[in-house]
Amino acid sequence: MATAPYGVRLLVGAATVAVEETMKLPRTILMYPMTLASQAAHVVMRFQQGLAELVIKGDNTLETLFPPKDEKPEWATFDEDLPDALEGTSIPLLGLSDASEAKNDDRRSDGRFALYSVSDTPETTTASRSADRSTNPKTAKHPKSAAKPTVPTPAVAAELDYPALTLAQLRARLHTLDVPELEALLAYEQATKARAPFQTLLANRITRATAK
């Protein structure tokens, strides 16, 4: 195949490129805003980075020309900064000294009044005994109180060995008792131990049995 002239090849190549760019034109138009935004963001970031580098260089230059002084605030004092005159001095503990003085005063006052208290002890004890005898003649004559009257044990209590029953055991046996037996147990409980849980249990059982 014969080679075409140079001018023809140039025109054909230009036409081909024009056709390809024309075919890419819709895609280029759609991507152009995104490309423009990314380029703008890149330019802004480069600008900020340049400003930061300039500031850092300025700080370094200022520190070189004007070195900072080691300043320490007045309130920042440490143990090693205190003068040597304070070494060896002791601070009196006011609370401990006051407490020791108060204890010494209490001991002295106890020692002073101990003689009077010892001398007055026999008289006060005899006076108190005579006063007790005069105010309580019945207790002196009858030191022992009268014993409580014995409560008769109902038959149902003796049958169940009621005094030895626990609350759970009594609850388990309530369904086998009728109303008179429950009332007898309640009266016996009130007259003897008067335990609130037992009284409540018996009273509730009597109420339910009566309602039936």
Swiss-Prot record:
Composition bias, Basic and acidic residues: 100-111
Start and end residues of each stretch annotated as Disordered: 97-151
InterPro entries, per the entry: LipDrop-assoc (IPR047728)
Cellular component aspect of the GO annotation: cytosol; peptidoglycan-based cell wall; plasma membrane
Protein name per Swiss-Prot or TrEMBL: Uncharacterized protein Rv1109c
Organism field: Mycobacterium tuberculosis (strain ATCC 25618 / H37Rv)
